[in-house]
Each structure stands twice: as C-alpha cells, then as structure tokens.
Amino acid sequence: MAEKACIKRLQKEYRALCKEPVSHVVARPSPNDILEWHYVLEGSEGTPFAGGFYYGKIKFPPEYPYKPPGITMTTPNGRFMTQKKICLSMSDFHPESWNPMWSVSSILTGLLSFMMDTSPTTGSVNTTVIEKQRLAKSSLAFNCKTPAFRKLFPEYVEKYNQQQLAEQATTQLTTPESPQKSDTKVESEKTIDPTKGDSEGGLKERKKNNKQGLPAWIILLLVSVFGVVMALPLLQL
C-alpha cells in the first residue's frame, strides 16, 4: 500500500508533466496503480535511435521519494535488455546515490541521455549502429501490439496508423509504374520490328524487280529495228 506522501508526490509530478512536458519524453501512471508508470522515449535526431519510440515502465516503491524506483524497457532497442531492470544512479540498483529531489521527468531525462551513451552497465547490450537503426524503424509497430501501450498512448497508435496509410498510398502509386514501363518497352519493340520488316521487305522487292524482264519500250524498239533489218533485202529488189 502506497503511503500518502508517495501518492501526493506522484500526483504532483504528473500534473507538472502535463503542464510542462519534457522534450522527447512522455510518461503516464497506470489507471489502476499510481506506483506503476509507463513511459515513451523518442530517439534523438543524429543518433542511431532517431525515429524510434521506446516504451517501458517505472515501478515506484511505496516509500518514494525516499527510495528509488525500478526501471525497465519493453521495446527492443539495441541498448538495454528488455524486461530487465536497468542499472542507473537514479534506479533501485543504487539506493545509496538516490536523491529524493529527483522526479519522474529527471529520471526519464537521465535514462534518455544514458541511452544515447555507449557505456556498459547492468542490463545493457552491445549492438551495431545498423541494428539499432533497424529496431528504431520497427519500434512503433512493436509497441502497438502491446495492449497497455495502445490504451495509455493513443496518440502514438494514431501516428502508427497514419504511417501505415501513407505507406499503402505510396505502394499504390508506385505499383502501376512497372506495367507502364513494360508496355513502353513492348511498344518500342513493336515500333522497331515493322521498320525492320519494311527494310527486309524492300530489299526482297528490289531483288524481285531486278529479276523481271526488260522494260516494254526497249522491247518495242528492238522489234522495230529487227523489222527494218529484215526489210532491207526487199527494198534492194
């Protein structure tokens, strides 16, 4: 059972977050348990996590703010193990370094900053930049399969749906291009083939004409000359 001081503190922090949201961070308490908070970290531009949306949970002890919370991440990210507590100076891994003045926003800001780092810690993993980028690209789709995420962060679900519609529209616009290109190629081939056929046909026609007899006027001339030659002896008589 959470202490009254803990409940009042968390309610106050939630109101502060709603009034002054933290850049790249969204956090909300569970409707049924104010000790369990759900968060989304947005990957910073210029990092392998750019475009990623990383969902996780913060579990506060009833003694908060005098004791630190436990922090886990649900979304595969390439930096931290999923469903495993992350070792931070602001988490229950290090109660000796905890400061009661720290808040939910400062915890998540610190987590986001540490996520961009490469320092190893308990609960961290070592992956390539390409792997982190791949996970960032698929993060929103992964999150939208989680019922708690869909319930607590409807704006991100809407964002995912809009992305899907945009991708479908792009696919529909680009798909007809391939048949058109094929048709153009076929038409081009058709244009070339008749020309080739005409060329071959013309060559055959010329050969055929060459094989035909002499023109008619030449034949008539030859017949006339032949007739005159044959008539010469008769004229001498």
From Swiss-Prot:
Residues 180-204 have a biased composition (Basic and acidic residues). It is an enzyme of class 2 (transferase). Residues 5-162 form the UBC core domain. Pathway: Protein modification; protein ubiquitination. The active site is at 87 (glycyl thioester intermediate). GO terms for molecular function: ATP binding; ubiquitin conjugating enzyme activity; ubiquitin-protein transferase activity. Residues 168-207 are annotated as: Disordered. It catalyses: S-ubiquitinyl-[E1 ubiquitin-activating enzyme]-L-cysteine + [E2 ubiquitin-conjugating enzyme]-L-cysteine = [E1 ubiquitin-activating enzyme]-L-cysteine + S-ubiquitinyl-[E2 ubiquitin-conjugating enzyme]-L-cysteine. GO terms for cellular component: membrane. Accepts the ubiquitin from the E1 complex and catalyzes its covalent attachment to other proteins. Belongs to the ubiquitin-conjugating enzyme family. This is Ubiquitin-conjugating enzyme E2 34. It comes from Arabidopsis thaliana (Mouse-ear cress). The gene is UBC34.
